[in-house]
Amino acid sequence: MSQQHTLPVTLPAALSQKLLDTVPPPVNTQQEQRKQPAPLPPPCQKVPVELPVEVLSKHEEKHMTIVKGVPEQECEQQQPQEQELQQQHWEQDKEHQKAENPEQQLKQEKVQREKQQLQGQLEEEKKLLDQQLDQELAKRDEQLGTKKEQLLEFPEQQEGQLKHLEQEEGHLELPEQQEGQLKNLEHQEKPLELPEQQEGQLKHLEQQEKPLELPEQQEGQLKHLEQQEGQSELPEQQRGQPKYLEQEEGQLKHLEEQKGQLKHLEHEEGQLELPEQVGQPKHLEQLEKQLEHPEQQEGQLKHLEEEEGQVKHLGEQEEQLKHLEQQEEQLKHLEQQEGQLEHLEQQEGQLKHLEQHEGQLELPEQQVGQSKHLEQEEKQLEHPEQQEGQLKHLGKQKAQLELTEQVGQPKHLEQQEKQLEHPQQQEEQLKPQEQQEGQLKDLEQQERQLEQPVFASAPGQVQDIQQALPPKGEVLLPVEQQQQKQEVQGQHE
């Protein structure tokens, strides 16, 4: 017996593919494989077959063959192609499911439409909100702009006043220079003394310069602002400024007149000068130049101090503006309260009118109650002996009725107020009043008949007094009023 040697045999790729194709696929994928034939796998690629893990592993071990001459890089390039094929396969499955389930497709379409509608609504709401925000911002910007303009108006007015004051100071510098020159001339020209009129004018100029100093002006402005705060009106501030400007203009005119007088005096002095004083003008010019520098420095220092005072003054004015705004808000609140008071006064007038109307309605109702009570008592007066006592009793009851009606008025008034709300009920109430007036006239006639002489009964005769019941269609008085009547009767007895 010759020994048989078994050698491992490697099958080619075509045979391994045939063996794999013989395996039946699952039930769900049979139709798809019939419609679309599976493409041939490239070399070095595992065939995707849905088989148990054990079977696949066995077949892979037996039938995996390596193709010679194919590098590994080509296999790596073939992997993305496999992914694309799988995606196409999934898309085909989805289309097939959509064709089988049209209801789900319709539901999905509805959901998408609803999402689109909601997105459109959200966008519209966002647009509206943006517009509202823009409008509110624009309004706030306008309000801030108006407030800034109002605040800026005051500094502008103050700047104008400062310029005006600077001009006045420039005009005042000339008289000061002239004073220095005059003093120098007095020292150099002892025989040429100035007349007494010039000295009086110089003193007058010094007195005028003192009230024009800025600190005193600021005090006057502060007093003026305090008066304006009491009035709390901006237009009145502007009215006070023209008066102040008129005063300044008057002072400037007066200064100009004084300048003219000084020029006239200088001209006279020039005529009185001796020929030896020809060299004096140059000396005077040098002195004037020397005097200008310290005066300029002093003017600058004063100007700086004035600016600092003005800055403080602006801060005070801003606080005043805030205070004025608060006062305006308080005024608006007071106006609202006044409107509410007027409304309350109108309501009080209406209540008074209702009370008057109720007072007019009380009389016929009292008469109705009295007439019913008198009718009951007249029916009881069947016997002549009882008439005298009952007449007295009637008088007492009338007095009691007046008291009880006053006590029961609050409840009665409330009922009347409810009745007054309906005009139809008022008309119905007026009809029985007319009937009551006729009944009262009949009662007065019956009372006159009762006042006639009464015959006394026999001594042994006994009379039975019964309480008369009200006739049909009439109602007795309330229990509370009857009790009050009995109490009043006991007090009178």
Swiss-Prot record:
Substrate of transglutaminase. Specific glutamines or lysines are cross-linked to keratins, desmoplakin and to inter involucrin molecules. PROSITE patterns: INVOLUCRIN. Residues 76-89, 473-493 have a biased composition (Low complexity). It is found in: Cytoplasm. Its main location: cytoplasm. Pfam families: Involucrin, Involucrin_N. Residues 228-240 have a biased composition (Polar residues). Residues 90-116, 139-151, 161-174, 184-193, 201-213, 250-270, 282-360, 372-386, 411-431, 439-450 have a biased composition (Basic and acidic residues). One of its GO terms (biological process) is response to UV-B. Keywords: Cytoplasm, Keratinization, Repeat. Coiled coil: none annotated. The keyword Iron does not apply. Residues 1-47, 60-123, 139-493 are annotated as: Disordered. The keyword Cytoplasm applies. One of its GO terms (cellular component) is cytoplasm. Keratinocytes of epidermis and other stratified squamous epithelia. It comes from the Eukaryota. Part of the insoluble cornified cell envelope (CE) of stratified squamous epithelia. Directly or indirectly cross-linked to cornifelin (CNFN). Belongs to the involucrin family. This is Involucrin.
